[in-house]
Structures are given as C-alpha cells and as structure tokens.
C-alpha cells in the first residue's frame, strides 16, 4: 500500500506522524511531498534542512506532472494544501481514499470576513463539494479547525 503525505513545508511537529506512517506501511511505501524543502528562518533557529533525505519529494513546477501521477496512484493521500482540491476531486471520483487536514480557516483578526474574498469563497465551495464524497475525510488540527470546517457545512 502506497501512502502520499503532502505538507506545505517540513515541520518538525509533523515528522513523528510521518515516521509512524512509515512504521505502519513500510519505509519505502510512504512519501513526504512538499513544495518548500526548507525555510531559512527555521534553519537559522537550528532546525534541519532535510534537503538530502531520500524519503522527501520536492514538488516543483518542473516535476508537477510526475507529482500528479504520484497523487493519483497512491492508495492513500493525506494532504494539507488547499490548492490541490482539483487533484483531490479526481482521486475521489475514482473512489480513492483521500484525507485533507488543516488548521483554522478563520483565524482571529479577519475571521469569517475571509469569506468575502472570492478565492476563499471558491475554496469553501470546492471543499463543500469534496465533502460529499464518501471517501473524503477531514482531519482537523485542533478544536477551532473542526469548528471552522463544521461552520462551512
């Protein structure tokens, strides 16, 4: 069973979960994919850059077709990048197990006023559509994230 774990960056808080997936499904069966290999401010704070890791797949415009194939062919996809909703929908249409996880949609400050922005409104529409598939699951990263997604319907 092949698992694709997609995050916007490498986060030391999420690596234990990734390691647990590798222990369950096998070292060679789980790929960590990210468009941002390292953030300069994290490296300055002493975090590893992870650039040389063979388990890491760097998503770039030059390999996006290959990445899309990995996305469609994986048995399980866990994704936290909202902009990949079209890729998620294609997987869902073919009955593949797809998880989306996120933090809050409506963080303090602007909050629900974000819904007035056309891009956010479109994302809400897309994720409401995705949530109608029986093989789509939302994993809330915190109580407020669950509240926000529940608010969207």
Residue map of PLM features:
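Glycine-rich, highly charged phosphate/nucleotide-binding loops
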Residues: 49-68, 83-84
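Membrane-proximal helix-turn-helix segments that form the acceptor-binding/catalytic region
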Residues: 106, 117-138, 147, 151-152
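Short His-centered aromatic/hydrophobic patch
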Residues: 79-85, 102-103
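N-terminal subdomain of nucleotide-sugar transferases
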Residues: 1-53, 72-74
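Active-site proximal beta-strand in glycosyltransferases
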Residues: 76, 91-111, 139
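Alpha-helix capping/helix-boundary segments
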Residues: 83-84, 144-146
């Amino acid at each position: 069973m092949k698992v694709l774990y997609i995050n916007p960056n490498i986060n030391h808080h999420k690596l234990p979960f990734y390691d647990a997936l590798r222990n369950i499904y096998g070292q060679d069966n789980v790929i960590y994919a990210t468009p941002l290999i390292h953030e300069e401010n994290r490296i300055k704070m002493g975090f590893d850059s992870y650039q040389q890791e063979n388990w890491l797949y760097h998503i770039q415009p030059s390999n996006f077709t290959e990445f899309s194939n990995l996305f469609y062919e994986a048995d399980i996809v866990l994704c936290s990048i909202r902009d990949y909703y079209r890729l998620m929908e294609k997987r869902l249409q073919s009955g593949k197990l797809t998880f989306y996880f996120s933090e809050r949609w409506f963080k303090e400050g602007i909050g629900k006023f974000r819904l007035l922005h056309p891009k956010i409104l479109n994302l809400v529409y897309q994720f409401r559509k995705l949530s109608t598939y029986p093989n789509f699951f939302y994993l809330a990263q915190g109580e407020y994230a669950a509240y926000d997604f529940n608010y969207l319907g």
